[in-house]
Amino acid sequence: MLSKSLFTIAILLLWLLAFCVGAFIDSNPLRARLAQEFDIETFLLVISAWIPTNLAFLSILAGLSGALCRSFLRSVEVGIEQIRPGKERSRIIGGGVAGLLFYLSLMAGAFLLMNEPFETTTKQQYFRVAGVVSFIGFLAGFRPDLLRRILNNLPGF
């Protein structure tokens, strides 16, 4: 139980760190510099701060935190001795996968609707999209059947 608590705190701190990186680091000049000359430090900053990749991190971390919250609630409801660790671990990993699936469906929709949805990005755009992605990623991890219902309402799924 203690290790799951520490893992949950680590996931929440990583989500907060990823959100702050996406919110406070402007990736547009970094991407321009990277296009001229490659260096690993700039590359890693672009990977962590550019909206599409940052949203992937946020979505996966939100899915994991949703699954971890569900796991904590489940252990309170049925008792910790009734929970099988292997099955619980796969549910938590499934939460991260559900967050990733939502992110992939969002990206597919963004590129279907616009030619270059992330060519130039703004902080306002980031705050709007990051909030929605994180919230639905959390719900997808907390209640995986919810993701299925959301995707069923989208044409083509």
Identify the meaning behind each predicted range.
Residues S134, F138, F142, L146-L147:
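Hydrophobic transmembrane alpha-helical segments of multi-pass transport and channel proteins
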Residues R70, G99, D145:
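Short, electropositive, low-hydrophobicity segments enriched in small/polar residues
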Residues M1-I93, M107-V133, R148-F157:
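N-terminal soluble segments of membrane proteins
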Residues I93-G99:
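Core segments of transmembrane alpha-helices
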Residues G99-G109:
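Hydrophobic alpha-helical transmembrane segments in multi-pass integral membrane proteins
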